[in-house]
Each structure stands twice: as structure tokens, then as C-alpha cells.
């Protein structure tokens, strides 16, 4: 603080350039210099520079504390950010696994559906082939029955033309005897 006072006195040296006697109360430069020195003396007596320095020291301690808190908060924020980044990576990996699993399950379900469809088509094809075979057998049977019916009708017509009433009576008697012989 003493250095500051000396500096203030030296800064007042241009007051020496004023005209007339310097130590006169009519010289404004002298009055200003004197007032400044008295003001500085009062400040020194009241220990204002010490108080100002104390306040500045307190403020610097407070600023230092706030800076340390800010550093701690920044480190905590970095830690939290790193944690969130790890969690985000884990979530992305889990989502990728879920998508891959769903894709695999969908592919397996599609394969199963294809296999079921093939089996269903094979069953329907077999059933259709069975129906076709049954229809063929029915058609063959109907044709045979029709052929037998036509043959019997033709034979009956042929026999009726060739048979006389006496020959028909003899044939009926012979058939009755043959049936009796087989049942006894």
C-alpha cells in the first residue's frame, strides 16, 4: 500500500508546474494534492486497503471453491455421460439382438409354414388322387354293370327269339332240379 501512496504522490508531480507558489492555499493544484494525500491517509488509517484485500481474498477463495465445485460437477457430468453412452450402446446391442432374434424366429416360422403348406398340399393331393381312383373304380364298375346289363338284355333277347315255349319249360325244369341238387 505504501508503494501505491508513493505512486500517487509522484503522479501529482505535474502540479509542480503550476505558476506561483505551490504551498499557497490559492493554488488549486496544491489543494487537490493536499486533499488527495489526506484522503489517502484516511484510507490508510481506516485500514481500508487491508479490508479490500481481505474482501478480495475472500472472493478469490469463494471463486476457487466455485471452480473446484465446477470441476467436480464437470467430472460427474462426464461420468454420467459415459454411463449413458455405455447404457445406450447396451440398449442398441440389445435392440440388435432382439431384431436378429425376431428375424430368426420369423424365418423359422416361415420355414415351418412352408413345411406345413407342403404337408397340407401333399394330403390334399393324396385325397384328390384317392377321389380320382374311387371315381375311376366307380366308373369302371358302372360301365361293367351297364355292360353286364346290356349283355343280359341281349342274351335274354337272343334266347327269347331262339327259345320255343316247350324248350323254355324244359330249361326251367332243369334249372329247378339243379338248384335242388345244390341245396340238398
Curated annotation (Swiss-Prot):
It is a single-pass membrane protein. CDD domains: ATP-synt_Fo_b. This is ATP synthase subunit b 1. NCBIfam families: PRK13455.1. Belongs to the ATPase B chain family. HAMAP family: ATP_synth_b_bprime. F-type ATPases have 2 components, F(1) - the catalytic core - and F(0) - the membrane proton channel. F(1) has five subunits: alpha(3), beta(3), gamma(1), delta(1), epsilon(1). F(0) has three main subunits: a(1), b(2) and c(10-14). The alpha and beta chains form an alternating ring which encloses part of the gamma chain. F(1) is attached to F(0) by a central stalk formed by the gamma and epsilon chains, while a peripheral stalk is formed by the delta and b chains. GO terms for molecular function: proton-transporting ATP synthase activity, rotational mechanism; proton-transporting ATPase activity, rotational mechanism. GO terms for cellular component: plasma membrane; proton-transporting ATP synthase complex.
